[in-house]
């Protein structure tokens, strides 16, 4: 989609499990442009780009005093304004730009609407990290991935014959809501899996590694204190649905 003289908007993602997971191609583009705008950029990656002569403008302050939805809208508008008035604009955020990233998906849609030339550099997404972590042979067994809130909205989407990865688990529970907000999700899972089905909570701690806790579906409540913004829930139908004690592992 890029024009001969280069794209007006460039989207790139840094890794979901390591701050330095930024592809060589994305780094080369950042050096070529000489400046980037970024959201949630870790200090190690900012320092790396600075050593390469890239000026980094963080947009995190646009969230100050605003609800998250308004903050995301402000970030998107700031990126689009640069792409339109002072291109090229390169925006770096966590994960793969077109997977589990509402801002970058919106930016792609707006770039197409405004007929802005665009280039996207994929990043290491949470799905990539988890597939590698738990050793899923996606080509053989398949893998159903959907956000927890998306599953609640489309109950018929659940396929108990394939391993299930529920993304954005914390999104089921609005800020300030009680743990009872997870009730409908648990009931939906109980309708498809036995009470003894092992389920694994996976939290991505960035540079701190990945933590896992496995319990039976009947004991979902034991996972509640550990659910955070990075949490995903994995249901591995390859494992026999038998009662087991909670296990924890940190890599």
What are these regions (language model features)?
Residues 1-20, 24-121, 223, 231-232:
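Class I S-adenosyl-L-methionine
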């Amino acid at each position: 989609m890029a024009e001969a003289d280069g794209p007006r908007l460039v989207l790139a993602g840094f890794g979901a499990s390591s701050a330095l997971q930024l592809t060589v191609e994305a780094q080369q583009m950042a050096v070529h442009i000489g400046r980037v705008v970024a959201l949630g950029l870790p200090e190690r990656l900012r320092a790396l780009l600075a050593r390469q002569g890239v000026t980094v403008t963080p947009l995190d302050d646009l969230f100050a005093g605003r609800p998250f939805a308004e903050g995301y809208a402000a970030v998107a508008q700031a990126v689009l304004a640069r792409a339109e008035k002072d291109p090229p604009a390169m925006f770096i955020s966590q994960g793969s730009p077109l997977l589990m990233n509402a801002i970058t998906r919106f930016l792609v849609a707006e770039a197409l609407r405004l007929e802005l030339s665009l280039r996207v550099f994929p990043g290491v997404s949470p799905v990539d990290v988890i597939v590698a972590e738990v050793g899923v042979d996606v080509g053989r067994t398949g893998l159903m991935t959907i956000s927890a809130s998306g599953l609640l909205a489309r109950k018929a989407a659940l396929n108990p014959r394939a391993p299930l990865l529920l993304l954005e688990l914390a999104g089921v529970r609005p800020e300030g809501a009680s743990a009872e907000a997870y009730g409908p999700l648990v009931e939906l899972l109980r309708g498809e899996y036995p009470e003894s089905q092992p389920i694994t909570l996976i939290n991505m701690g960035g540079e701190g590694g990945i933590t896992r806790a496995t319990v039976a579906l009947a004991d979902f409540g034991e996972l509640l204190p550990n659910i955070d913004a990075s949490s995903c829930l994995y249901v591995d139908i390859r494992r026999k649905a038998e009662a087991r004690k909670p296990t924890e592992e940190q890599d």
